[in-house]
Each structure stands twice: as C-alpha cells, then as structure tokens.
Amino acid sequence: MIRAPLVKALGALGSPTHQMASRAVRTSAMVAQTPAKAPEKIEVFVDDIPVQVVPGTTVLQAAAQIGVEIPRFCYHERLAVAGNCRMCLVEVEKSPKPVAACAMPVMKGWRIKTNSDLTRKAREGVMEFLLMNHPLDCPICDQGGECDLQDQAMAFGSDRSRFTDINYTGKRAVEDKDIGPLVKTIMTRCIHCTRCVRFASEIAGVDDLGTTGRGNDMQIGTYVEKLFLTELSGNVIDLCPVGALTNKPYSFVARPWEIRKVSSIDVLDAVGSNIVVSTRTNEVLRILPRENEDVNEEWLADKSRFACDGLKRQRLVAPMVRMPNGELQAVEWEGALIAVAKAIKAAGGQIAGISGQLADLEAQVALKDLLNRLGSEVVATEQGFIAGGTDNRANYLLNSTIAGLEEADAVLLVGTNPRYEAPLVNTRLRKAYVHNELQIASIGPKIDLSYDHENLGADAALVKDVCSGAHAFSKVLEGAKKPAIIIGADLLERADGAAIHATVAEYCKKLKKPNWNPFNVLQTNAAQVGALDVGYKAGAQTAVKAQPKVLFLLNADAGKVTREQLPKDCFVVYIGSHGDNGASIADAVLPGAAYTEKQGIYVNTEGRPQQTLPGVSPPGMAREDWKILRALSEVVGKPLPYDNLDELRNRLEDVAPHLTRLGQLEPAGDAGAAGTISKSIGGGAIDIKLKELRDYFMTDAISRASPTMAKCISAVNKQQRENEAKQSVAI
C-alpha cells in the first residue's frame, strides 16, 4: 500500500560604585568630546594625489582612502595604535626622517611619499632586522601560505641580508609557553608586534599577556606560568602576523591552498557569528571568523571556533529503531520510516513536537506543517518562555541590537552572564565601557565580567525596586541617553518569569527614546527566535502536558524531557545529528545533518535571519532534517507541499515573510505580555547557569562531543585547583 509513496520519499532523502566613578573620570580624560559641528576637512597629498581627510586622520588611513596600501605588522583597525614594528615608515616632504604612518596624524598640505627611495630603503632595513632573528621555519610552520611576514618580505624586503654566518653569531631562541589547549606557541617566531597583548587587554578584558625583558631579550608571555584561558583566546591566532601563535588542534593538519572555504554562520550560541568553514576531503578542518560589522565584527568565540572536532564524533550515521530487548538497532530508511508511520497512525492525532537549539528554520516549518496535517497543533521549543508572550516579537528579542549596545551608556543585566552566554555581545558591552563611559549593574549571582560593574544583589525583588524608581540605579537608567536592560532567557523560565518580564517591559516604555528600544532578552539558543517567529509554543513542558502517543524531538538534546514524564506507550522519534540526550530516549532515531552540512536559516537573538551553507556532505545515511520530514509525510499519506528548498522557502515566506530577507532586521514594537500579569515577582535568589568559564565550553550536542572542549574544561579545572592550592599555602 505504501510502496509507491515510499519510493518517492526515499528519493527525497537524496565597591564597585567607587570603581565606576574613578573609571568614568579616567575614561573621560582619554576620550575626546564629540564636537557639535563636523570639522572641516583638510587636503593632503599621497604620492601627489590630493586627498580630503578630517583632522586627526593618520597617514596610513589617508593612504587607504585612495587605495594605497602601506605595509604594517603591529597596526590593527580595532586595536590601539602601538607604532612599534616600524614597517609602515613613509617619507614626508621637509621631514628630517621617515615617520610611522600608523601613528602620525596628517597636517594640512603634507606631501607623503609611500614609494620613494627613502621609504623603500627604510622598509628593507626594518624587514632585515625582523628576519635577523626569525627562524627559517616556513616549510614546517602552520602559518605558511597565509603569513604576513612571508608576503611583506617578498613585496618590500631586500634580496639579501648582511647578517650572515661570518658577521653574525646566530639567531636567538626563546622558550615556548604553555598557555592552554587551544593556542600553540612557538615564541622564537615572535616579532613583538604586541597585537595579542593589546587584544587580551582591550577586547577580551584580561591582562594575562604582556612583555618582559628589553631589546633583544624581550618576550611575550604570561608573566608567571599560567594558562591564557578566556572565551575569546582563539582570536590571537588570527591577529598574529607570523607563526608564533597558531591553532593547536589544527597543528600540521593542512595547508591553506589544500582546503575549500565556505561562508556560513555559527549556531552554537544565539549571536549568529559569521564564519568561514574550511574543509578537505569531506571533513571540516577548522572554522575562522568572517567579518560582519552588525554581528561579530571580525571576532569569534572559542566554542564556535574549536568545537568543530565534535562534528566528527558521536555522529548518527544510520536510522535506528529500538528493538523489544531495549536496544537500538540500525535499519534501512525504509524500515525506520515504516516504523514511525505505524506509530503515527496508531496515535490518532495525539502527536507533539519539540524543537531543540540546533534545529534550522526549514525543519521547524516542515515539522509544524506535518503535525498540523496529522491533526496536532502541539509544537513547542525546548527552552521555555513566558506564557502569552510570544505573540509580540519584541518580547523575546535583543531590541537594542548587538551593534547598538555599543551606544548604550547605562545597562542593567538581570539574570544573565553575557560573557559566557554570548561572548560577542559581551565584547560590545566592553567596547561601550571603554569608549562610552558605560555604567553597568547586575541583578543575580556575582559574576566575573570583563569590565567593572556593580552587583546590586541576587534577590529577584530587586527587579521591582529598580523598575519602580525606588533604587539608586533607577536614576542612572532614567538619566541615561541610551539605557538598556538585558534579561537572561533562562530567567524567564522561573515561575515568576512572566511577572519579571512584564515589570521590566513596562519600565522600558518609560526609558524608551526615539530610535532606541531599551528592552532586551538575551537568547542562548540559536533556534529559539526562529521557532517562536513561526508559531511554536514555548517550553518542552507544553508538549509533555499533552501526554502524546508520538513525540518528535527535533535536535532536542538539552535533557528537558525524560521517559518518566511521558506515557509508557509514547513513541519517541529523534531527528538530529548526534547521539546525545535526545537519541538516548528515542524509539526511532533518524540521522540528520549538522549545520556545516546543510543550507538552513537561523534567526539570532536580535531577530536577524542568516543562513548556513553546506561545506561537507552528511555522513553515512544522514540527511537534511526537512527532507526526512518530507519523506515521512509521504509514507504516512500526508505529503507536504514542497519537494525542494526553494518551494519550502516559499512556504516560509507565506508564514513569516521577514524571515526570508536574509541579513536584515525587521523592526519590532514595544515589549509587553499579552493580557495582564497578575502574579507578583516571587522572592528567592536569581541563579545563572553559565557562571564560570568551565560552564561555557559544553552547552550543546556538538560541543559535548568535542575532545577539544573536554580538554578546555580539564585545563580550567586544573588551573583552579592550582590557584586554590597556592591560596591555602599563603594562608
């Protein structure tokens, strides 16, 4: 009876307050006040080409305006100017000696020569000094092929050196530092550009790296022997212009010209960082950041970068059905789909679905459509949210936007730790703290943020105090030009979550400014916003309360549903990529594709839809999630009305048109729960899941399968034990 549709289906599968005050004074002294009127531009000449620039523009920036590239090692657009590599020396007419282009502001009428004999000779001299102590490691260096020193030595260096064996005693050697399981160090290659030091201090907010010694004895290190453990440590690999700091898990794996690169997005948190997936022979080898000023700038969190080895482990590669003896046994797709179809037909419409944190939007729409055709409306997200609050998008979005948080001048964090829940949102807050005199306070447990903040306490009743104007920090928020309140998504799963949400939302209406919405919910789940946008109910308990006879788990691996909560005869179907919590309780396991193996839309915490692109094929018999659901619909006799991705995207456009406009933000209105919330905010302390660095590394099925993430947790635990031992000895 089902043979014909089955063939088609299988085909488809092809005191802090004082610290704040002192910091504000210090920052105000460093940051110049923005003038009310834009300054008049001045004219300078770069290689005899006139350029109009604003006062304060450096020589390097002026040259860049007309496409003239000046070599540099230490300079980076997002870091403070150091001016210590001297590779950017240029000639300025009437100047007695070359000037450092990265650090020298232009003056009116200057004539700058970037390719004169003096400039070329200066660059050759600097390069000769750099190579004097640099080892000839290029054949065995992981940076080979994408090394700034290689490129600039070819373009601007001399063809010979005066430091020969006759006249020179030999190159120096520097001991390598062990700074953790992520960054490999070969410090003999270091050219002392100090990019890593400035990144750690300015962006990551940890002063672990620095310089010791002088002249030829200068070294980059951690002062005392310790690990460089921060949620952003991998970015020093991208910043390092030579092979001194490289990717330790990627060591000796591949050369740049051997790999294929695919632009995609990260889904291991709700930021939606833009990434480049590097692959070879159908294997993901590494992940690098891709620049997007609105989302992640050019940074990438460590979990997003290094957890890619989890894509090769604990994978589901064949459909499985649980046998009478309780064991899962691998079967063909035909057998698995028939087993699920039989359970569906016996359920009589008592079916529910739960979407987890790695589910793409297309699969969520396909699951919802399938259950609707089978007579069920019970589709829910694994993560909870307030009842009645999903009708208004502004209720669950980061309305100030990720980039917009840089402009905030007062922020209240409620039940969230952005440093580990969304590291690249935290970098924006730190940026505002450094450059915008941002004042930050938190309600919840004491947390280690990368900037000074005032902890108001952990009692939930403090939310009411602040929002009623009775607290001292209320005056700070009300006096700010762009205030923001950020609520942790996990906090809203509390019994009084709706009351907290409503109280903050009402207060934010008072704080709202033109073109500025201060109400924010920081999601931690890449699939949450998209699911709520297409009509999913919030919380796994919504599905559990329905007591279904068939339950679909779509990448739901957080362990929020157990067999004990379900009817004894409930048939659980898991669709996902990894053997994790969801697969362990399933009666049928249908192997899906991971985010690097499919084209799928994810909506980040600010409501921006972006898509992943496939870099490799799914392993074994695994298929894209929506194709599995399409095939299953054929088998149960309720075929879904789309056979390819374009048709499915057309269906998505009917459901939520804004979700097909990739990369664009759809403005949301004011937050506020539907109806009146009568419950008051309960007492008790607010808690946070991700309090420490060790909590950050394993939060989903992919990172839990990653050996590198396991090494990170071991390293953090080891260092903490050593620190505790030192403290006990000191006492």
Swiss-Prot record:
Catalyses which reaction(s): a ubiquinone + NADH + 5 H(+)(in) = a ubiquinol + NAD(+) + 4 H(+)(out)
Sequence positions that bind [4Fe-4S] cluster 2: 190, 193, 196, 240
SUPFAM superfamilies: 2Fe-2S ferredoxin-like (SSF54292), 4Fe-4S ferredoxins (SSF54862), Formate dehydrogenase/DMSO reductase, domains 1-3 (SSF53706)
Residues annotated to bind [4Fe-4S] cluster 1: 134, 138, 141, 147
Enzyme class of the recorded protein, top EC level: translocase
Xref: InterPro entries: 2Fe-2S_ferredoxin-like_sf (IPR036010), 2Fe-2S_ferredoxin-type (IPR001041), Mopterin_OxRdtase (IPR006656), Mopterin_OxRdtase_4Fe-4S_dom (IPR006963), NADH_UbQ_OxRdtase_75kDa_su_CS (IPR000283), NADH_UbQ_OxRdtase_ferredoxin (IPR054351), NADH_UbQ_OxRdtase_Gsu (IPR010228), NADH_UbQ_OxRdtase_Gsu_4Fe4S-bd (IPR019574)
The protein's name: NADH-ubiquinone oxidoreductase 75 kDa subunit, mitochondrial
Organism encoding this protein: Drosophila melanogaster
